[in-house]
Amino acid sequence: MAKNLSIIDRAIVGFDSSLRAIIPHSNQTARPLPVSSDALPQLSITESRHVAGLMRINHTGEVCAQGLYHGQAFTAKDDLVKQAMQHSADEEIDHLVWCETRLDELGSHPSVFTPVWYGLSFGLGAIAGIISDEFSLGFVAETEAQVSEHLQDHIDQLPEQDTRSKEILAQMNIEELEHREAALNHGGKALSAPVRISMRWMANRMKNLAYHL
């Protein structure tokens, strides 16, 4: 269907997707929260602040995923790769909304730097797509692998009674690994050690800032 759109139409659709990624409460999810109970866990003030910081990091990660996928789809050379990027971005919208919902429940908010995170990620995704589809897909695979690592770390850090956040992050982790496999199956190549290390360094800076702001 996207093939029938004019350049202007694609630009409008892309701009709309970008706005939805950075404006709170502008997306709807086709799937409910992946939780077994609607009851909110009882948390102390300190626990609530820590959980909010972790969920803000995860929300920021989903914003970055949107930027990355949108940027790669914008410059990808192969139509199948573009479709794969868009499909993954669509699934990540659910993750974005789930994190946003949990932040609301905690009386907190997304990172104030959300537009910056999105813009930087879009640029990285676009550059990766320009280099080659194989590099772009490898970039996705490595990103998802690193996201899975920090999701598992966050699950371990959550208070024992906060099964709500744990279930959300556990489902996200399953799907992040599926996106990694999809990227590899579409031809993604392993990245060099310097690129992987640089990605991890940038991700750590983002996490440190997003936890507080």
Curated annotation (Swiss-Prot):
<dbReference type="InterPro" id="IPR047809">
    <property type="entry name" value="COQ7_proteobact"/>
</dbReference>
<feature type="binding site">
    <location>
        <position position="92"/>
    </location>
    <ligand>
        <name>Fe cation 1</name>
    </ligand>
</feature>
<dbReference type="GO" id="GO:0046872">
    <property type="term" value="F:metal ion binding"/>
</dbReference>
<dbReference type="GO" id="GO:0005886">
    <property type="term" value="C:plasma membrane"/>
</dbReference>
<dbReference type="Pfam" id="PF03232">
    <property type="entry name" value="COQ7"/>
</dbReference>
<dbReference type="GO" id="GO:0006744">
    <property type="term" value="P:ubiquinone biosynthetic process"/>
</dbReference>
<keyword id="KW-0479">Metal-binding</keyword>
<comment type="pathway">
    <text>Cofactor biosynthesis; ubiquinone biosynthesis.</text>
</comment>
<feature type="binding site">
    <location>
        <position position="95"/>
    </location>
    <ligand>
        <name>Fe cation 1</name>
    </ligand>
</feature>
<feature type="binding site">
    <location>
        <position position="62"/>
    </location>
    <ligand>
        <name>Fe cation 1</name>
    </ligand>
</feature>
<keyword id="KW-0560">Oxidoreductase</keyword>
<feature type="binding site">
    <location>
        <position position="176"/>
    </location>
    <ligand>
        <name>Fe cation 1</name>
    </ligand>
</feature>
<comment type="function">
    <text>Catalyzes the hydroxylation of 2-nonaprenyl-3-methyl-6-methoxy-1,4-benzoquinol during ubiquinone biosynthesis.</text>
</comment>
<dbReference type="InterPro" id="IPR012347">
    <property type="entry name" value="Ferritin-like"/>
</dbReference>
<keyword id="KW-0408">Iron</keyword>
<keyword id="KW-0472">Membrane</keyword>
<dbReference type="GO" id="GO:0008682">
    <property type="term" value="F:3-demethoxyubiquinol 3-hydroxylase activity"/>
</dbReference>
<keyword id="KW-0831">Ubiquinone biosynthesis</keyword>
<feature type="binding site">
    <location>
        <position position="144"/>
    </location>
    <ligand>
        <name>Fe cation 2</name>
    </ligand>
</feature>
<keyword id="KW-0503">Monooxygenase</keyword>
<feature type="binding site">
    <location>
        <position position="92"/>
    </location>
    <ligand>
        <name>Fe cation 2</name>
    </ligand>
</feature>
<keyword id="KW-1003">Cell membrane</keyword>
<feature type="binding site">
    <location>
        <position position="176"/>
    </location>
    <ligand>
        <name>Fe cation 2</name>
    </ligand>
</feature>
<feature type="binding site">
    <location>
        <position position="179"/>
    </location>
    <ligand>
        <name>Fe cation 2</name>
    </ligand>
</feature>
<protein>
    <recommendedName>
        <fullName>3-demethoxyubiquinol 3-hydroxylase</fullName>
        <ecNumber>1.14.99.60</ecNumber>
    </recommendedName>
</protein>
<dbReference type="InterPro" id="IPR009078">
    <property type="entry name" value="Ferritin-like_SF"/>
</dbReference>
<dbReference type="InterPro" id="IPR011566">
    <property type="entry name" value="Ubq_synth_Coq7"/>
</dbReference>
<comment type="similarity">
    <text>Belongs to the COQ7 family.</text>
</comment>
